[in-house]
């Protein structure tokens, strides 16, 4: 569960820039959905419980009016109110990042790209991901 959790300071400028890019490129995410690009569609958003905020992925199951609907793709670490697989609705304005993952190819994933840039190259290579735009 927690092996994929990476902690960043809220002051980390590179990660903040990655979140900003993820949010600002949401139109590309919508383009890929409209084109029927194969893969698993996920969005990342802040989830707060017990006074602590984590940034977590949700696998999409649908769209609403300005919202994404889906299932939590990870087990939250800051409490027990939510669990992996819980159905959530997230406002598009709250989305920090997005991914379309098909095998080892990933569109988006700007916060993941930053996390990989911050780790040793050998460790990042073990994930076998090729990022696309």
Feature names for model-found ranges:
Residues 1-57, 61-133:
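Mixed-charge, low-complexity intrinsically disordered regions
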């Amino acid at each position: 569960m927690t092996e994929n959790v990476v902690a960043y300071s809220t002051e980390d400028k590179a990660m903040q820039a990655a979140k900003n890019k993820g949010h600002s490129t949401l139109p590309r995410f919508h383009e890929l959905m409209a084109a029927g690009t194969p893969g698993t569609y996920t969005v990342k958003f802040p989830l707060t419980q017990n006074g602590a905020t984590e940034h977590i992925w949700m696998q999409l199951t649908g769209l609403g009016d300005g919202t994404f609907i889906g299932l939590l793709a990870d087990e939250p670490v800051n409490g027990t109110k939510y669990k992996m697989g819980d159905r959530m609705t997230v406002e598009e304005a709250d989305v920090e990042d997005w991914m379309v993952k098909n095998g080892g190819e990933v569109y988006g994933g700007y916060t993941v790209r930053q996390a990989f840039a911050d780790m040793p190259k050998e460790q990042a290579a073990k994930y076998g991901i090729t990022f696309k735009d």
